[in-house]
Amino acid sequence: MAVYFVTGKLGSGKTLVSVGKIQDKIVAGCKIATNLDLRLQNLPQVGRFAKTPRVLRIPDKPSISDLLAIGRGNDSYDENKNGLLVLDECGTWFNTRSWNDKERQPIIDWFLHARKLGWDIIFLVQDLSIVDKQARSALAENVVYCRRLDRITLPFVGTLYSLITGSKMPLPKLHVGVVKYGDSQLSPTVERWLYTGKNLYNAYDTKQAFSSNYDSGVYSYLTPYLSHGRYFKPLNLGQKMKLTKIYLKKFSRVLCLAIGFASAFTYSYITQPKPEVKKVVSQTYDFDKFTIDSSQRLNLSYRYVFKDSKGKLINSDDLQKQGYSLTYIDLCTVSIKKGNSNEIVKCN
């Protein structure tokens, strides 16, 4: 079983990375229980047509009866199929006063034995120092430190950009959760959770306020198909054309620029002159009247210069380009072959 304390400053993405883990568990077919207000149909990997998610909403500050009501998270011995319990605003539960509160003791005992019930747990707190030391020792198997990369300024480049534009250099809104094995920042890093914000913002209530006077008990979310998917109507032709016009108007400049680049590239490719291929004209020679005028040996290669009956010099490289093969016999004797013809040429 894995227990995670997810920490980070306000707006650092604690809830977002936790919703990302909820999505991963739903896709894997696992059971979920949480005190977060979720919009399951907006989870990008779940969608409005999903029929199988099992997600329980528990009170903002659950009692022992609420935790007992969610039952088992996994009936098998495969811990990869464990359910996931996600609880936000846990700083008020695990401070020194609450940890020693006798009324909270049954809840703490349940957390300590959650492994036997097949639950993985994610606790969200702003800072680990809020949590009682005994609670950290007993439960903090993994601690996740959340960071937002768009709040970081790149050295030198970011400063130069700010001097030129007068504003902070925009960076991708990427949320990183660094998972440490243990409750110390010096503990070894076991993994990193990476999530982009845009596709998960609509999947939960980012302005949810937690209250001790939550008036609803444990209940199950309707599957996205029952709440949204079955009411979905396919777009007719007119609606599709209207959407097409909207998107064309929105991206018209980018589209025109792309078409311009593509047209220019196509035109330059078509009108580019093709390189001329030099044709080697094969000639016939009367090798009976050839003599070796000179020969040269370079390591394992040989080069000959021949003289025909008219005194014209022809080198062996030109003959080879015309398809003749030369076989070295000695510096004064060579065999010239092409097809079925084979001639011996010697020195004068």
Swiss-Prot record:
Keywords: ATP-binding, Host membrane, Membrane, Nucleotide-binding, Transmembrane, Transmembrane helix, Viral extrusion, Viral release from host cell. One of its GO terms (biological process) is viral extrusion. Pfam families: Zot. The chain crosses the membrane at residues 254-270. It is a single-pass membrane protein. Signal peptide: none annotated. The keyword Amino-acid biosynthesis does not apply. It is found in: Host membrane. ATP binds at residues 8-15. Isoform G1P plays an essential role in phage assembly. It is required to increase the number of adhesion zones between the inner and outer membranes of the host cell. The extrusion of neo-synthesized phages occurs at these adhesion sites. May be involved with G4P in creating zone through which the phage assembled and extruded. This is Gene 1 protein. It comes from Enterobacteria phage f1. The lineage of its organism: Viruses, Monodnaviria, Loebvirae, Hofneiviricota, Faserviricetes. The gene is I.
